[in-house]
Amino acid sequence: MSIFYSFSALRGLAMGIFSPIWILYLISKDYDFLQIGLMGAVLEIAKLIFEVPSGVFADRYGIKISIASSFFFSILTWAFFPFIDSAAICILAMIIWALSDSLISGSFETWMSRVAGEDRFGKEMMKNTQLLITFLIIGSIASGYLYSLNIYFPFLLVMVIYLLLFIWMSVFIKVPSVSETNHGDQNQHDSIKIIKESLKIIFNKKRVLLIVIAGFFTATAYDTISRYWQPFLSDLGFSEKSLGYIFALGGFTALVLLTLTIRFEKKIEKNPYLALTSLDSMGMVMTFLLSRAFRPLGIPCTAFLLAIEDIHHPIVTSYLNKFFPDSYKNTLFSLNSGVGAIGEILSGVIFGIISAAFGLSAMFVVVAVFLLIPIILYTIVPKIKDNDMKVQIEKSQQV
């Protein structure tokens, strides 16, 4: 599993460097809140367009090509960033960024599930997230300092990290193929069949469907928070360096929560709904408190909200992995991400308009109310009884 740990460390370092400052960089280039929201919407619309085709691409042509391509497009994304004074260049950067995210979305998890096996997958996913966050903290602490030295230097450094990952993945890494039993039907490589079978699994498995729908609302809420926390805290008087430290504190909070999650992994595996309900209930409370614009609450509330999505993702991914056959896994994870991308598109448009018209405080109140919907869905899911669709699909492939 060491290769996954190394990849997670480098990806976390890159994310830690650009995440705290890229919105501030847009503001420094005279983009207002509505324009930032619309650029975010462009990013998410492009993700939605690319999500399912990229999953099918990975299922047909292999995980290695998909992940290596993701790193290549990440290099291009951050190469364009210093030139986003032009709206056209900014839109192009958002589209390439979306393609990069879509190509690795689901592929990394599928690769890990093949190596770790279903029994160890959930725990290994959390360990990798833990390591990613550790290096995200390191990157975010350095981010504000690097940005204050030169606003372009952080993006150059991120390019170098993704270049290393691209060379490593392209030249030195071997990815295990899907088992032979899942290759018995040559038609499985037909893109339309892959999508049809994947949709059949989601719609016939009501528990999976409701978790995916809940993901739409959580993606909408947490994407809005991640997009607007920087200008919100900046308006409260926090400096650029302080924002980097707050982002690092969010990473540290996620690290602590992940450590607890790993410790209680077996209990969470038995009842993931309780864990998700607890997380989003706390998220709703913290978002409402943040909306009060009380400076002392800004740091702890933001840190916790930044941490939630990092805990959310491995719990949901581990849960869905149980129902996804390996031959369609990339596409299924991409479909789930695609639903989240729809929520993030609406986040950029709807909450961009709300923030421009009524201010960021009012917008965060609406976000808090939005989180009530997935909490309700989590109480419904355990009451639903479904047949094991994954077993049925895999048996049909062996015939």
UniProtKB/Swiss-Prot annotation:
Record's keyword annotation contains Membrane: yes
Keyword Transcription regulation set for record: no
Domain of life: Bacteria
InterPro entries in the cross-refs: MFS, MFS_DHA3_Transporter, MFS_dom, MFS_trans_sf
GO molecular function annotation: transmembrane transporter activity
Keywords attached to this entry: Cell membrane, Membrane, Transmembrane, Transmembrane helix, Transport
Protein name as it appears in the record: Uncharacterized MFS-type transporter YxaM
Gene source species: Bacillus subtilis (strain 168)
